């Protein structure tokens, strides 16, 4: 068999197949995840590949029907039980969708300056004035954020 004939046969098998793994290709994502990839690989290398076909709906046998009759056991019912069964049920109320709890907003202090517009040096000066301690972190952004948080807590 020539290589082109094998490729054509594999192409036809893949087009008719319901499984990606019939024609094994180690570079394809589906083949890497497939449970039977070793079997497909062996079949593809030996070109002993069966040609699967999709089942038509009329070819599939209908499932056997189960008997609908059930054995019933006789129960002794009292008058109270009969009243409970015949009493009208209360209307079911639909649960109201719960609204998400709102985040609590921190009370805004009118004396609080706008920290976003301040430079890092200005923040450091303000921290020294208000006796606020802060820690230097590896990232200047984190250091700035922590300094601003400490300053807000001091107001």
From Swiss-Prot:
The keyword Cell division does not apply. Keywords: DNA replication, Transcription, Transcription regulation. The keyword ATP-binding does not apply. GO terms for biological process: DNA replication. Residues 55-68, 78-95 have a biased composition (Basic and acidic residues). Required for late gene transcription and DNA replication. This is Gene 27 protein. It comes from Bacillus phage SP01 (Bacteriophage SP01).
């Amino acid at each position: 068999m020539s290589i082109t004939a094998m490729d054509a046969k594999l192409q036809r098998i893949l087009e008719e197949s319901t499984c990606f793994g019939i024609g094994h290709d180690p570079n394809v994502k589906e083949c890497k995840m497939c449970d039977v990839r070793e079997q497909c690989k062996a079949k593809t290398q030996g070109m002993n590949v069966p040609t699967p076909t999709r089942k038509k709906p009329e070819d599939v046998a209908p499932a056997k029907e189960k008997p609908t009759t059930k054995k019933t056991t006789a129960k002794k019912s009292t008058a109270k039980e009969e009243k409970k069964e015949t009493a009208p049920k209360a209307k079911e109320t639909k649960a109201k969708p719960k609204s998400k709890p709102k985040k609590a907003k921190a009370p805004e202090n009118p004396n609080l300056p706008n920290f976003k517009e301040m430079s890092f040096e200005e923040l450091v000066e303000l921290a020294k004035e208000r006796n606020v301690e802060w820690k230097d972190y590896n990232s200047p952004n984190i250091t700035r954020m922590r300094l601003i948080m400490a300053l807000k807590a001091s107001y």
